[in-house]
Amino acid sequence: FKKIFSENYTCILTTSHELIPLMARSFAVSEDKIKVWGQPRNDGLFQKNDCREILGQLFPDLPEYTKTVLYAPTFRDYGQVQLFPFKDFDQKQLEAFLDEKNMLLFIRTHVAEQGSAAPYLGKRIRFLGNEQAEDVTGILNIFDCLITDYSSIYIDYLLTDKPMIFL
């Protein structure tokens, strides 16, 4: 069975050169049949997306800005995410900082927690929900920085070679 199965492949795709030997053994093919093509879902990260055009379409009333930050915490089955988990968190201080630095902060929560962002929203803090972007992966490259915890979104964002902050 393995011989018949493995002889029918022209090539097998993988995401990195390090996986070539493993994939070759797993599919019982020679390493030259393994091609590194990355993750198709990340193709959008390598396109030239116009940040102002995309955000302008999603949020027509945005104030002037120079930098954009995406805050994407992980969904937790055991309770609602606390978006700003600091005892000394000060909403007014965050808004003043964003205003002073001419920045926008976009909060992206799991679809089950969309209401949790409401108390934090304002002129420079916006909610980027499924209504605006069903899959945020294709537009990750429009953000200048990512803030997350242990969400796997950071793995895709690594491809942008931009700063990340882990909470």
Language-model segments: residues:
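Active-site and donor-binding regions of nucleotide-sugar-utilizing enzymes
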Residues: F1-F46
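A donor-sugar binding/catalytic signature common to diverse glycosyltransferases
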Residues: A133-L167
